[in-house]
């Protein structure tokens, strides 16, 4: 654990277990691998063992965005004028209680391993730029982005040549990535050839898709328990749901063009591929949800009909009674004019 000061702002950083706290951490930034303009640059550092870490943050005392209005109504959280939670962090050494630190912020930073292959994917699809994740539903101009990128990635290059090319044509901070770390990333998303003992690499869309399929399979096998699943769905639909969710979890790490290439993947019968059928999973889940919506609509109509029928106190069905109006027919006797009848003379006044 260490405390850094950048631009007058103190940061509490939880370091990896294998990192020596006595050493200085030199961090650098790279563009977000998803090429989403609304996302900040990612902050990285590489330790002496060649492991690459990303510095991420977590803030206590701040609810999720979807419950912001409810939290305000319940007075659950309190914020400053800058919309920061009014909280402090206490760091205490359990072995020595006199050794402690008070941190006037509820935000802590932690380190997680980062795969440089995702930044290489972002470089390959550097023309596929999106404003936010909502743009991923639109597949327009994806083909043009792939075409324009492929023109500049047709050559096989050595690791050192790729290192120089990335530094000069993508971002200058690529110079902070070691050749060994870059080599491990290139091996995951590139085709390779060997000549005179030297290995040459060329990033291709096919290799990128294969790399991402491996990530999807790994997420499906170790599906996060925090993500709700379909409880009453058939087993095959549950599996499709996991594949769809695992694919969508990669949105924050890959450009839109790479995402749409992944959506169209479907293994052939003779390939012997064990990767999930992404395309079929999306189609089957969508068809199931559509059918389920129709069934729910029919079920709702039946429920409304049952509610209209109702039950009486004895548990018997009480059918709705129609109000019947009985019409009384009145017999109207015809009036006889005076002096016209045959018996009128008998009752004649004298």
UniProtKB/Swiss-Prot annotation:
Main location: nucleus
Sequence segments annotated as region (Disordered): 134-153
Compartments in which it is found: Nucleus
Record carries keyword Nucleus: yes
One CC-aspect GO term: ribonuclease H2 complex
Family stated for the protein in its record: Belongs to the RNase H2 subunit B family. Highly divergent.
Complex and partners: The RNase 2 complex is a heterotrimer composed of the catalytic subunit RNH201 and of the non-catalytic subunits RNH202 and RNH203.
Any further remark recorded for this protein: Present with 2340 molecules/cell in log phase SD medium.
The protein's name in its UniProt record: Ribonuclease H2 subunit B
Species in which this protein is naturally found: Saccharomyces cerevisiae (strain ATCC 204508 / S288c)
Gene: RNH202
């Amino acid at each position: 654990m260490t405390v850094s000061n950048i631009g007058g702002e103190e940061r509490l950083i939880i370091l990896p277990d294998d990192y020596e706290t006595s050493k200085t951490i030199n961090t650098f930034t790279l563009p977000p691998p998803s090429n989403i303009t609304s996302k900040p640059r990612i902050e990285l550092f590489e330790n002496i063992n060649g492991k690459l870490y990303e510095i991420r943050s977590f803030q206590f005392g701040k609810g999720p965005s979807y419950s912001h209005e409810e939290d305000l109504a319940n007075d659950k959280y309190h914020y400053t004028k800058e919309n920061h939670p009014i909280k402090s962090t206490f760091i205490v050494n359990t072995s020595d209680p006199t050794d402690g630190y008070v941190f006037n912020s509820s935000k802590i930073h932690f380190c997680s391993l980062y795969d440089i292959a995702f930044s290489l994917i972002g470089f390959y699809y550097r023309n596929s730029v999106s404003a936010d994740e909502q743009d991923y539903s639109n597949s327009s101009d994806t083909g043009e982005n792939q075409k324009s990128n492929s023109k500049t990635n047709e050559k096989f290059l050595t690791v050192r040549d790729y290192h120089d090319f990335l530094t000069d044509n993508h971002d200058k901070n690529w110079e902070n990535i070691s050749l060994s770390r870059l080599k491990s990333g290139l091996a995951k998303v590139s085709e390779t050839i060997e000549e005179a003992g030297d290995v040459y690499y060329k990033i291709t869309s096919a290799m990128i898709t294969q790399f991402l399929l491996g990530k999807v399979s790994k997420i499906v096998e170790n599906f996060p328990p925090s993500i709700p699943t379909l409880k009453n769905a058939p087993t095959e639909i549950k599996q499709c749901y996991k594949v769809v969710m695992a694919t969508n979890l990669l949105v924050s790490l890959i450009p839109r063009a790479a995402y749409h290439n992944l959506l169209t993947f479907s293994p052939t019968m003779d390939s012997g591929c064990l990767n999930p059928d992404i395309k079929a999973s999306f189609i089957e889940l969508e068809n199931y949800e559509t059918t389920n919506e129709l069934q729910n609509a029919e079920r709702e109509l039946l429920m409304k009909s049952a509610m209209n029928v109702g039950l009486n106190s004895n548990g018997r069905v009480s059918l709705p009674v129609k109000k019947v109006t009985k019409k009384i027919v009145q017999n109207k006797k015809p009036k006889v004019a005076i002096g016209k009848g045959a018996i009128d003379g008998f009752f004649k006044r004298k």
